[in-house]
């Protein structure tokens, strides 16, 4: 197994995930099989209980793993299906070691960070690296490992030490370290400053790891003199110092790496030049250029509660992008904080309230994504009502589906106090209820998670046609509340149709509103399986409806 390790320095948020994914893309384009591992040094065992404001969205895998959003980047870029074990956290490592200690596996020894924690990290990496993720038999050729955080963080020290030991045990020709750093330009001086990167590499070298390549993030391409200076002070050949400067879209990043011969530097270090071919990135080039040249736009109102951080809805944004490009449209995301639509906001901040409604009405379609808690839900209900009454294309995902059921029950059935038991436990009309198998005492890993089957009830519905009329679809889930089965009959009698259910027929998965251009709610999360070359059918239909092309597409 060959290992490519990506670390980061100076500041977080430099784009290590995109860089690691792009490295995987280029190596895969050279004919190699690639897998990925993300290391998160936090103590949580997984990302499931972390707020989107902390680390962005929680990405869900087929096996139900709740993981860091960078694994979503890996799946989209590399077109692979990862497992929960491809995300290593400090919590998982310590839990596994403590479990072994309680069983007596260490035979009376004092359990310490070195060697027990570091050995557990190495064992985890080497065992997960050989699990095939591309649908083929046998292990991959290269495992790309991204270490989260920045070099020098206390919590990442055991992982740095484990990677140092791994580099020694597997041998230099099986280990390539790429350090992502920042090269800022100070406004007054206007010079590309190398000192932050110098300090970061010095810190890395002090911990026993020497980078083979530097991936330098900057606004503009690195100057030759900047590369020479970095080479001199960081002991990295100038040819191995990569300029990862700002580009129009992230699909240019693999192309940047190819243009700078990053693949040859990596292949040379890993002794793979003899078996790898030149990278074939025609599809990536076409996609990047297509996006750059799009002129026709479509305005999408994103009505959510985490709108202050776009990474909270990263997979939704990517799924919209994939769908728009397949339809030759450029997405214009119009962020609407759900709470700004509520009547209370009109009293507190009338200008903010008016601006939110103006944005909503100016959009060609409305999307209400997933979320938890009752903040902003009344605003979402108002958005769903506006879409339903004004024939505006609407897509509700997870919470967004439940919102549309609540709105319909209130407005059409006349149940003014209809609500979700999540938002109002004492509601007389709970049209959304807690799952029978859910846990009320533990939050972590107790939801309905991962890939589940949804069976279609009517193949004439829009959703079934978009999926090409299969008997069922497999999509990923993440919820602990669902539509009340006892409310379904009344809702359907009033015109809201449930077109997809689970294998029991009791759990509602898809709803549609007939005689509406596109009014769809789904309990699952279609965004998690969208790929650049294979956009989610639901997002494609949503975008087509917004541009008035859905009817022609379906016929």
How would you label these PLM feature ranges?
Residues 174-175, 451, 507-508:
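Short glycine-rich loop/turn motifs
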Residues 1-332, 338-365, 372-373, 380-386, ...:
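Flexible phosphate-sensing "switch/lid" loops adjacent to ATP/NTP-binding sites
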Residues 8, 38, 218, 245, ...:
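Active-site proximal loops enriched in glycine and acidic residues that flank catalytic Cys/His/Asp
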Residues 21-25, 29, 359-462, 526, ...:
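Cysteine-nucleophile active-site neighborhood
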Residues 458-555:
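C-terminal and late-domain segments of enzyme folds
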Residues 239, 275-279, 395-396, 415-421, ...:
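Acidic/polar loop patches that form or flank catalytic/metal-binding clefts of enzymes
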Residues 49-52, 228-229, 409-412, 514-516:
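Short low-complexity, flexible loop/linker segments enriched in glycine and/or proline
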């Amino acid at each position: 197994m060959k290992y490519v390790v990506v670390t980061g320095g100076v500041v977080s948020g430099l784009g290590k995930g995109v860089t690691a994914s792009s490295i995987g893309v280029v190596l895969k384009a050279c004919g190699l099989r690639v897998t990925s591992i993300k290391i998160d040094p936090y103590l949580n065992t997984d990302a499931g209980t972390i707020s989107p404001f902390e680390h962005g969205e929680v990405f869900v895998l087929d096996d139900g793993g709740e993981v860091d959003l960078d694994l979503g980047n890996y799946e989209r870029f590399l077109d692979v299906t990862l497992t929960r074990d491809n995300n290593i956290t400090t919590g998982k490592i310590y839990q596994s070691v403590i479990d072994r200690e309680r069983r007596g596996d260490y035979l009376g020894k004092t359990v310490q960070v070195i060697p027990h924690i570091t050995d557990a990290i190495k064992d985890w990496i080497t065992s997960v690296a050989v699990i095939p993720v591309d649908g083929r038999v046998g292990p991959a050729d290269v495992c790309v490992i991204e270490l989260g955080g920045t070099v020098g963080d206390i919590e990442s020290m055991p992982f740095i030490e484990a990677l140092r030991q791994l580099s020694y045990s597997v041998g230099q020709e099986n280990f390539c370290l790429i350090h992502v750093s920042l090269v800022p330009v100070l406004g007054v001086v206007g010079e590309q400053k190398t000192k932050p990167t110098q300090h970061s590499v010095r810190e890395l070298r002090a911990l026993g790891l020497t980078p083979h390549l530097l991936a330098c993030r900057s606004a503009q391409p690195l100057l030759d003199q900047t590369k020479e200076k970095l080479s001199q002070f960081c002991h990295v050949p100038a040819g191995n110092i990569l300029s990862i400067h700002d580009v129009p879209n992230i699909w240019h990043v693999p192309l940047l790496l190819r243009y700078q011969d990053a693949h040859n530097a990596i292949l040379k270090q890993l002794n793979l030049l003899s078996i790898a071919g030149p990278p074939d990135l025609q599809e990536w080039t076409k996609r990047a250029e297509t996006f750059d040249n799009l002129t026709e736009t479509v305005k999408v109102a994103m009505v959510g509660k985490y709108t202050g951080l776009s990474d909270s809805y990263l997979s939704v944004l990517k799924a919209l992008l994939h769908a728009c490009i397949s339809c030759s449209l450029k997405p214009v995301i119009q962020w609407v904080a759900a709470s700004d639509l509520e009547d209370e906001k009109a009293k507190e901040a009338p200008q903010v309230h008016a601006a939110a409604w103006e944005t909503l009405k100016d959009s060609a379609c409305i999307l209400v994504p997933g979320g938890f808690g009752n903040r902003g839900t009344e605003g979402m209900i108002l958005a769903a009502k506006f879409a339903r009454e004004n024939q505006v294309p609407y897509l509700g995902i997870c919470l967004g589906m439940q919102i549309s059921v609540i709105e319909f029950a209130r407005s059409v059935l006349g149940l003014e106090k209809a609500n979700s038991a999540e938002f109002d436990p004492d509601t007389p009309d709970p049209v959304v209820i807690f799952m029978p198998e859910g846990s009320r005492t533990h939050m972590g890993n107790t939801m309905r998670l991962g890939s589940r089957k949804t069976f279609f009830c009517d193949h004439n519905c829009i959703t079934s046609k978009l999926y090409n009329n299969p008997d069922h679809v497999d999509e990923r889930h993440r919820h602990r509340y669902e539509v009340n089965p006892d409310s379904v009959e009344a809702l359907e009698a009033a015109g809201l149709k449930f077109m997809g259910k689970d294998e029991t027929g009791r759990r509602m998965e898809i709803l549609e509103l007939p005689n509406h251009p596109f009014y769809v709610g789904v309990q699952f999360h279609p965004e998690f399986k969208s790929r650049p070359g294979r956009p989610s059918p639901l997002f494609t239909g949503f975008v087509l409806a917004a541009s008035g092309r859905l009817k022609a597409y379906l016929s």
